């Protein structure tokens, strides 16, 4: 009996090792294929989405899920302890109206402004200005709508961390619409953080050495300056992500200083650029040589593209737990001593004021760039167009000044975006959509996602941020309708603002498909996949294994009928495996093997459970 037991344990250990090895192989094949597809999105985009593309995508998804399950089930005794915060939310009310407003403006006037706006206004002229105005109007309406919903929640003593909280209260934590709103906002903030990291790397390691060399700072001094800025950026990230509670007041003061300097530099630079061009707006009102429907459509599409420059006011709602219940208001509280405003009111004022100030700065800078008339070819060829405009029109000192503004914008945008993404992931964990382990270590998973998304390139990150945030904001706006219970009709006149804003956001998101269909497909599929992962998590061990086994076999048949080659991923492959990894042949093999192993595991588990003796029911004397 003892020998049989030892043999059984040895067989189980061998099975675990083989299962883990198969899981690693499946994950490697899936990672190679996904890296190739991501590289294709970054370089070429995607004009069509054929049946073969769909089959390949489903195959990669099935391989990723199956490989993860095989590897995880084979090593159940391994536990990875991630540095984490307690899952239960904690309040640290230290920020007042001024700090909240500074954080909102800093999150909105981010590094994308320096790359997107100069090129967009040079290329699209009046359409760009109209798009900025339309995006500003939409954001003001959204801020007002969110302010009303926030007031309703706080008046009733409900949590209101982030805009998706409105959807959660209106529809419940198990609503698919709530999940889409929360997850979309998490992806949007993660993509924005990845974009900030990407352009920061381009600036520090590509542009800054050349700028320093122009002032005679080459060699070791330039290396030290680059290293110092990199260390400061890393220290700012660590302070905000890991030491936020300890240094929360210092972080708020730093955000206030950074944002103030950023706004002053942008306003001064805009005035100088406009003065250099004589504020000559000749030709600005010349509409494109196309039909009215064409340029109206172009304006709508461009509005969706530029909305990235305005949605930072959403970060204010994520600071509900860090904001004081009452706060003085600058100037008014100086005149009326002791005057304070409740959080329910000053949050709404801060959101609207953020959009108004950001819109004024964005439009003023866009008009200044237009009248400065820089070389369109030079702007298009520049890695950071705002720096090129400053150098070519105003000279080197102003280029250095706008470079400082760019660094400040990166600091004020990256960290709020990263923290907002982390808070959204944690909220999904609190609501049961994610395992508590993932929620507690949310900052690590967001950081890994930033590294992954950064490989997709700047254009993809801008578009996916726009698409996901517009989808989320559309649902959040409509939550104001769902929140109202005292109604006689499905939609009433008082719902006009919420319905108008929500539908406008969803239309703008749909319009992005015209420009970047790959982004719309990627965003929509990512939402479906994320909800699928939640469903699998909810199924339990047996249900997940059975589902993935069936998915693997079905996908194997699908790939046999519609084979496809993967784009070169740009990552090394083991010698002799290039042919298998470059097409769906290798993917089909690992899917078939994974499906068979999962079926065997499912059957063995069912048989083992059936063989277990039923639990003994203790005898009782009865009532």
Give residue ranges: language-model regions.
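Membrane-interface "cap" regions at the ends of multi-pass membrane proteins
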Residues: 2-129, 139-144, 329, 335-345, ...
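C-terminal membrane-solvent junction of multi-pass transporters and transport-like membrane proteins
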Residues: 4-19, 86-94, 248, 439, ...
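Membrane-interface loop-to-helix entry segments
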Residues: 11-22, 53-62, 73-76, 224-276, ...
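Loop-to-transmembrane helix boundary motifs in multi-pass membrane proteins
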Residues: 17-24, 97, 173-176, 190, ...
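Transmembrane helix-boundary motif of multi-pass solute transporters/channels
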Residues: 26-53, 92-202, 307, 316, ...
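Helix-loop-helix junctions that connect adjacent transmembrane segments
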Residues: 35-55, 79-94, 216-220, 225-226, ...
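Hydrophobic transmembrane alpha-helices that form the core helical bundles
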Residues: 119, 140-232, 237, 407-427, ...
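TM-loop-TM module centered on a large, flexible mid-protein loop between adjacent transmembrane helices
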Residues: 161-174, 209-210, 334-341, 350-415, ...
């Amino acid at each position: 009996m003892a020998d049989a037991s030892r043999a059984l344990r040895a067989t189980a250990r061998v099975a675990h090792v083989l299962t883990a090895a198969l899981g690693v192989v499946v994950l490697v094949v899936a990672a190679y294929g996904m890296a190739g597809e991501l590289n294709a999105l970054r370089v070429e985009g995607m004009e069509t989405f054929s049946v073969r593309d769909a089959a390949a995508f489903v195959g990669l998804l099935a391989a990723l899920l199956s490989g993860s399950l095989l590897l995880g089930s084979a090593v159940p005794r391994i536990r990875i302890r991630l540095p984490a915060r307690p899952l239960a939310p904690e309040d640290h009310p230290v920020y007042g109206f001024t700090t909240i407003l500074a954080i909102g403006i800093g999150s909105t006037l981010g590094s994308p402004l320096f790359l997107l706006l100069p090129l967009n206004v040079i290329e699209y002229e009046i359409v760009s200005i109209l798009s900025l105005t339309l995006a500003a109007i939409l954001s003001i309406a959204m801020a007002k709508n969110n302010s009303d919903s926030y007031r309703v929640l706080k008046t009733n003593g409900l949590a209101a961390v982030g805009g998706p909280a409105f959807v959660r209260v209106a529809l419940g934590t198990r609503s698919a619409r709530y999940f889409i709103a929360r997850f979309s906002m998490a992806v949007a903030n993660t993509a924005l953080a990845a974009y900030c990291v990407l352009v920061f790397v381009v600036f520090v390691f590509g542009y800054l050495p050349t700028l320093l060399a122009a002032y005679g700072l080459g060699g070791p001094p330039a290396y030290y300056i680059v290293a110092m800025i990199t260390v400061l950026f890393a220290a700012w990230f660590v302070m905000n992500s890991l030491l936020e509670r300890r240094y929360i007041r210092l972080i708020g003061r730093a955000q206030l200083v950074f944002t103030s300097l950023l706004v002053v530099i942008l306003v001064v630079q805009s005035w100088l650029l406009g003065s250099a061009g004589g504020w000559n707006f000749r030709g600005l009102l010349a509409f494109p040589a196309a039909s009215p429907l064409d340029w109206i459509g172009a304006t709508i599409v461009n509005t969706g593209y530029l909305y990235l420059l305005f949605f930072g006011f959403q970060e204010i709602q994520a600071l509900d737990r860090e904001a004081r219940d009452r706060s003085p208001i600058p100037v008014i509280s100086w005149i009326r001593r002791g005057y304070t405003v409740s959080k329910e009111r000053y949050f709404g004022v801060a959101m609207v004021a953020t959009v108004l100030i950001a819109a004024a700065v964005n439009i003023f800078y866009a008009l200044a760039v237009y009248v400065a008339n820089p070389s369109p070819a030079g702007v298009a060829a520049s890695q950071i167009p705002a720096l090129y405009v400053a150098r070519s029109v105003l000279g080197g000192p102003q280029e250095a000044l706008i470079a400082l503004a760019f660094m400040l914008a990166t600091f004020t945008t990256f960290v709020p975006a990263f923290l907002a993404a982390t808070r959204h992931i944690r909220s999904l964990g609190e609501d049961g959509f994610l395992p508590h382990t993932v929620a507690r270590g949310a900052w690590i998973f967001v950081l890994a996602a930033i590294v992954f998304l950064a490989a997709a390139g700047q254009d993809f990150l801008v578009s996916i941020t726009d698409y996901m945030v517009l989808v989320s904001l559309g649902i959040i706006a409509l939550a104001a309708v769902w929140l109202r219970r005292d109604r006689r009709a499905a939609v009433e006149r008082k719902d006009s603002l919420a319905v108008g804003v929500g539908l406008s956001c969803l239309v703008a998101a749909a319009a992005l498909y015209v420009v970047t269909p790959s982004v719309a497909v990627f965003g929509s599929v990512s939402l479906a996949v994320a909800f699928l992962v939640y469903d699998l998590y909810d199924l339990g061990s047996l249900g997940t294994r059975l589902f993935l086994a069936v998915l693997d076999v079905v996908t194997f048949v699908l790939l046999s009928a519609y084979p496809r080659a993967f784009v070169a991923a740009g990552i090394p492959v083991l010698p002799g495996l290039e042919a298998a990894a470059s097409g769906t042949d290798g993917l089909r093999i690992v899917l078939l093997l994974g499906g068979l192993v999962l079926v065997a595991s499912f059957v063995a588990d069912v048989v083992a459970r059936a063989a277990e003796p039923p639990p003994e029911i203790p005898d009782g004397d009865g009532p």
